[in-house]
Amino acid sequence: DNAMTDNVITRLLPDGSPDGEMKPMGYIADDLVADGTAEERGHMFFSNTDGNVNVGVWQCTPCTEEAIDYPFDQCCFVLDGTMTITDESGHTETYTAGDAYVIPRGFKGHFKMTGDYKNYFITVEPETKG
């Protein structure tokens, strides 16, 4: 099981699982890549029992992603590379190793990843009713 749900503390490792394995991931839809190629790899360390909170490590090749209606709230801690985020009003912030940021659900703008970008992430998806 690659996502722990037991009632134990889990150490986050920058290279993924304890054996250093990171698997292909596909968070970025091809039609949202505005520049470059999004080759994603990562590892999920934790998913809660409701399935709406996930914690992992994620890396991506240099590219620019368009965010139309970001699907979840997300907190990121940058491990490597650079992330430049521009919101729909044109405000830009740049994050490098050691920085952390939060993306709210519904965000509209662009994410530009420079270098082999890598971060830890926590996502919280909206709870589904009924």
What are these regions (language model features)?
Residues 67, 85, 119-121:
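Short hydrophobic/aromatic-rich beta-strand segments that constitute the beta-sheet cores
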Residues 43, 47, 51-70, 104-105:
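Conserved short histidine dyad/triad with adjacent acidic residue
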Residues 89-105:
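Short acidic-glycine-tyrosine-enriched beta hairpin
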Residues 1-52:
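A short, N-terminal "cap"/entry segment at the start of jelly-roll beta-barrel domains
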Residues 60, 70-85:
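Short, conserved beta-strand element in jelly-roll/cupin
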